[in-house]
Curated annotation (Swiss-Prot):
Gene Ontology CC annotations of this record: extracellular region
Molecular function terms from GO: sodium channel inhibitor activity; toxin activity
Organism name: Hadronyche versuta (Blue mountains funnel-web spider)
Alphabetical UniProt keywords: Disulfide bond, Ion channel impairing toxin, Knottin, Neurotoxin, Secreted, Toxin, Voltage-gated sodium channel impairing toxin
InterPro entries named in the record: Delta-hexatoxin
Free-text function comment from the UniProt entry: Lethal neurotoxin. Slows the inactivation of tetrodotoxin-sensitive voltage-gated sodium channels (Nav) by binding to site 3 of the channel, resulting in repetitive firing in autonomic and motor nerve fibers.
Listed name of the protein: Delta-hexatoxin-Hv1b
Tissue and organ expression note: Expressed by the venom gland.
Amino acid sequence: CSRSDGWCGKTEDCCCPMKCIKAWYKQNGNCQNTISAIWKNC
């Protein structure tokens, strides 16, 4: 996993979902439509 505030790609959604969620709340991420989609796609 990369920096905690890094951009979230598909691989990192599965690798570090919490990192992706944090970035999404900061509007720095490009997560799936919903948080649950991160888990479903893994």
